[in-house]
Amino acid sequence: MSVADINKQEVVKQFARGTNDTGSPEVQVALLTARINELTPHFKAHMKDHHSRRGLLKMVSRRRRLLDYLKKNDADRYRSLIEKLGLRK
């Protein structure tokens, strides 16, 4: 198993709402946040990598849409997720 798979399983286990939960908004946002945080140092070193930056921006916008959905439907879950991930300052 690769390091990414192990990290992914840990994130899913930490944010899952049930035993087999992999698709809830909390899990999806947590996985996207982990991938975004993993890619951020790459862009500090390779500022002109615009092709990969587009993928990063797509991930950020997907996370934003999921957070908007969660905020609209269940504000308490939204606030707890933001607090756990440390997204808002």
Swiss-Prot record:
Any Gene Ontology biological process: translation
SUPFAM superfamilies the record matches: S15/NS1 RNA-binding domain
PROSITE patterns, alphabetized: RIBOSOMAL_S15
Pfam family, one: Ribosomal_S15
Keyword annotations: Ribonucleoprotein, Ribosomal protein, RNA-binding, rRNA-binding
Entry GO CC: cytosolic small ribosomal subunit
Function: One of the primary rRNA binding proteins, it binds directly to 16S rRNA where it helps nucleate assembly of the platform of the 30S subunit by binding and bridging several RNA helices of the 16S rRNA. Forms an intersubunit bridge (bridge B4) with the 23S rRNA of the 50S subunit in the ribosome.
Record's subunit section: Part of the 30S ribosomal subunit. Forms a bridge to the 50S subunit in the 70S ribosome, contacting the 23S rRNA.
Protein name per Swiss-Prot or TrEMBL: Small ribosomal subunit protein uS15
Organism of provenance: Ralstonia nicotianae (strain ATCC BAA-1114 / GMI1000) (Ralstonia solanacearum)
Gene: rpsO
